């Protein structure tokens, strides 16, 4: 058994009889049986793949990658999460049995990374979709940092109390947002259609007259409207 900061057992007698509680016994059994579901979308996941080799050998922590969320109790997200992928990620998290944990790996997963400035389709942080237990910053994080995150998660598991797990499971901490993306095409003369011209902007009181043109040149123009 790997060493943990706090002991799990109350005391050990000379007759090799261990006295403990059901809560500590449950935590001890889950320490060496974290089965992760690997949810990698970009380059950060390549760093996690190096943990499978003999140099780092994450099998010593009892990590057994699973391909089904119903057999996993840990999901490791690595890479950019788009709005189209968000419902699938939430569905995978909801299908995992309880108790379950989440590790957010990389800057793109935590904050959206370099895509969070002007991208309309990037989720600004996976914690807006599912609760995160350990944040692992970096672009990308090193394999040693991934092992450190797993160690910190195991310490958190060793301190858990059964009553706290029940209360946290009753809370609805994850949510989804329906994003509708509409595409309207203008005429080839550079003028928007009549419906768009008749609409008044939400931040201004003046109306746009149908005779006004947004573009003076003749080209094919597309109007993108993102409705939250």
UniProtKB/Swiss-Prot annotation:
Binds 1 [4Fe-4S] cluster. Its cofactor is [4Fe-4S] cluster. Keywords: 4Fe-4S, Chloroplast, Iron, Iron-sulfur, Membrane, Metal-binding, NAD, NADP, Plastid, Plastoquinone, Quinone, Thylakoid, Translocase, Transport. Gene3D superfamilies: 3.40.50.12280. PROSITE patterns: COMPLEX1_20K. It is an enzyme of class 7 (translocase). [4Fe-4S] cluster binds at residues 43-44, 108, 139. One of its GO terms (molecular function) is quinone binding. It catalyses: a plastoquinone + NADH + (n+1) H(+)(in) = a plastoquinol + NAD(+) + n H(+)(out); a plastoquinone + NADPH + (n+1) H(+)(in) = a plastoquinol + NADP(+) + n H(+)(out). Disulfide bonds: none annotated. One of its GO terms (cellular component) is chloroplast thylakoid membrane. PANTHER family: NADH DEHYDROGENASE, NADH DEHYDROGENASE [UBIQUINONE] IRON-SULFUR PROTEIN 7, MITOCHONDRIAL. Belongs to the complex I 20 kDa subunit family. NDH is composed of at least 16 different subunits, 5 of which are encoded in the nucleus. This is NAD(P)H-quinone oxidoreductase subunit K, chloroplastic. It comes from Ceratophyllum demersum. The gene is ndhK.
